[in-house]
Structures are given as structure tokens and as C-alpha cells.
């Protein structure tokens, strides 16, 4: 009797049919025909590959192109999906539009959490890189829709420590020293002024009567200036210079006389001028003379009458020139 007849007689045909499509235990899942669909159906995370050429060459990528590639790999079919880029610079793209540094995907670990419409992507870069990629870094991209401020951020760590200002130079070089607005992000800006450039330190807390303050520093100790904002009106006053030991204020700056003005206005010396004398006894005597003082009375023969009277003018010096004093 044929085997098929025996199976039919025993009612085992359905069992045989199911067994022919069953997974084999000794295959340990290797015979699952649609692994991606299987992991999706059971809600499992997908470790896609430990050695994957991400993009296939070393050319630059935009974030949008990177997301399209992830979608083509089924990354959004699972609650969590990850892969690791192959360790070959020539076979992996470089993302250049993050705004916080280039991501070379060679050797990078890529993790995707969420759906195509509400995703979080995390990329961890290795300790060496190519294409200007940032090493030892963790980049995170969050996109819950275009209306919800999608974008990248890069975390600081022991290998990528945060500087005093997180981005070094903030933004691009501005056209002049008044171009940085009061409500701009705090940072250190480079500004063009008169064929050179100057450093603008900008601090903005966006609250209070003085919401922002700026310092302008010129090269080679060429001066420090500041200006402060008022409420929401911005910088109403121009730059004011901070005086230092090497940049002292002029007399005009503080409302004082210059040395030349002082020399032309102030008396620097007083003296008695040349001697004059006149016969007093049996002579004309001495009439009043403006600015003179009597300095001597001579009685040569020692009688009861003065023979001669002596006088000298009072003189004062202004700016090196002596003048006779007038009467009051």
C-alpha cells in the first residue's frame, strides 16, 4: 500500500502538510523566510547588521538622504533598529548638514527608535574618522514632524568637552560691530571693522531691565568697549570705552584742561622784577606806580631825611613768560 494512502487512511494528511512548512529546531531561526516581518510581528528589536556599507561610498549625504536610506533598510518597521557601519571609509557616507559637526558613518553605530513620522536616531562615532567627521561623539536626531523643530544635537563627553562657549566662534562673521542683536544667542562673535576684525562677547539672558550686554575687544590691547541693552529696546547707546593703564582718557574725555591749556591759564611763578630808584630828598619823590612795591629807603648821610626810595615790580610767570602785575 502506498505511503500516501496510509497517511490518508490514518487522517494524518493535515499534520503532514503543516509539518512541511514548519521551522526546524536545529536551524535556530535561520530558516525563517521573512526575518524582518517576523521580528516586526513579535515586536522585537532588530539588530540589522554588524558590518554594513552605509551608502556605499565616501561622498557627502544630507540628513534627508540618510533617512531615506534607513527607510529602504526597514529601519522604521521596528520599535528599535540598529546597525554598525563597516570599517571602510571608502564605503560609508559622511553627513554634513547636522549643524553640529560632520558624521562619518564608517564604523559608526546607528540606532533608530520610533516610526517614520516620529523618529529618534542616535549615531555613535568611533575614535578615528574621515571626511572631517567628529570622533568619539554621540549625535542625536529627533524629528516628530516638520512643524516640531526637527534637528540634530551633539552631546559633550570626556573626549569632547564643552568649551567656554559651546561652538567656539558663534555663527558666521558679521558685517560690523553693531550687527549682533541684543536678543541673539549668547556667544563669541567675529565682526569686521575697518579692514580688520574684532571680537564681540555677547551675553543675553532675555529678561530684566538689562537683558543683554556686549563687550568689544580689539587686537593687541587696542581697546575694550561695552554696551548694554534696556528692556526690549535693544542697544540704545553707542559703545563706551573702558579705560586702562595703556589706554588712558584724554583731558577732553574727563572735562579737564590739557597741559597746553593749563600752561596758558595758570601762574607758575611769582617774583620781584628789576630795581628802580628815585631821589626823595630835594627831588621829585615817588608817585603811585601800578604793580610796584617799595623795597628800600636809603639815607646815605644818616640825617633826618631819606635820600632815595627804591621799588621793584611784582611779576608773575605764565607759560614761560613773565608779566608785571597790575593794580587791583
Swiss-Prot record:
This is Tail fiber protein S'. GO terms for cellular component: host cell cytoplasm; virus tail, fiber. GO terms for biological process: adhesion receptor-mediated virion attachment to host cell; symbiont entry into host cell; viral tropism switching. Induction: Expressed in the late phase of the viral replicative cycle. Expression of late genes is activated by the viral late transcription activator C. Expressed alternatively with tail fiber protein S' (associated with tail fiber assembly protein U'). The switch from S-U to S'-U' is performed through inversion of a DNA segment called G by the phage invertase protein Gin. Keywords: Host cytoplasm, Host-virus interaction, Late protein, Viral attachment to host adhesion receptor, Viral attachment to host cell, Viral receptor tropism switching, Viral tail fiber protein, Viral tail protein, Virion, Virus entry into host cell. Component of the tail fiber that acts as a receptor binding protein. Binds to the primary receptor, thereby determining the host range. Two alternate tail fiber S and S' proteins are encoded extending the host range of the virus. It is found in: Virion; Host cytoplasm. It comes from Escherichia phage Mu (Bacteriophage Mu). Belongs to the caudovirales tail fiber protein family. The gene is S'. The keyword Cell inner membrane does not apply. Coiled coil: none annotated. The keyword Nucleotidyltransferase does not apply. InterPro entries: Phage_T7_Gp17_C. The orientation of the G segment is defined as G+ and G-. G+ orientation provides S-U fibers whereas G- provides S'-U' fibers. S-U and S'-U' dont have the same host range (e.g. respectively E.coli and C.freundii). Its main location: virion.
